[in-house]
Amino acid sequence: MQDRTHLVDDITGHRRMRRNRKADWTRRLVQENRLTVDDLIWPIFIVPGSGIVDPIAAMPGVNRMSIDKAVEAAREAAGLGIPALATFPNIEMELRDEIGSNSLEASNLINRATAAIKKAVPNIGIITDVALDPFTSHGHDGILRGGEIVNDETVDQVARAAVMQADAGADIIAPSEMMDGRIGAIRMALDAAGHQGVGIMSYATKFASAFYGPYREAISTGGLLKGDKKTYYIDPANGTEAIRDAALDVGEGADMLMVKPGLPYLDICWRMKEAFGLPTFAYQVSGEYTQIKAAAMNGWIDGERAMLETLLSFKRAGCDGVLTYFAVEVAKILAKR
């Protein structure tokens, strides 16, 4: 029989990586990571009033919604199999003050939204944030005194707010304000109030990123912000510091961990999952979303493929799920497969 060995066989030791890529069925058979609807958390923005669906110019396809419309959106999400929503309020300017006192109102916008959604769609998870930026007149995540974000007073306030959010029906508290000691304080406050079953998804590594701009428009804080958030968010250059920060949250009782933003920090996703083994999530933030949308709208990229590829990259990096504004769009695509 004629020897049909090729030079390539000698070079590769008869190992050819393309054999497993030769057909659709083989590619599907050996695929290492898959994106499913179970991986999706949908962030939504809540505004006062009723009957409101207000498009956000900087986030094409994303709307601010009044509570009644948010309930309708929750029904749609549940029908598509999306496990959970993450809710963010855009409250009236006259309710915002230096200390974010409206965060401690039991009947504030976010708590009313939680109660309404849980009543109408009890089988969908509700994840709420206790950061003060939607409630402050200066746009910072904590209490501002003398030009400084005061850590301990802010921790006291967000722990109290967490209990109120749990009282309203929140399933998971996701504190994003990056104050030292907040996870332990929230855990103790929740347990003392009888909310042992309410989880904490820590924004364990939230970076001082350029990718948050459209979000700040969505909650109307961009024009309010005095200075920057570099004294409490993590420097984008610091990976080891990020893991140390996450380790403190794990020790204080975090049930889940989050990396924010997502795509620029896939290395942190991987390191955090490897280090702690806790359920790990990435937040595909507003700037990441808008980049894809804007490029697709201009015909520069295939928007659907880019969307799915970036979401799959989070799974490959070790994430158990993703907070993404694409959630409903992706869920509809996956349902057709």
Segments predicted by a language model, with ranges:
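Alpha/beta enzyme core
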Residues: 2-3, 11, 23, 35-41, ...
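Exposed beta-strand/loop interface patches that mediate assembly or binding
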Residues: 13-19
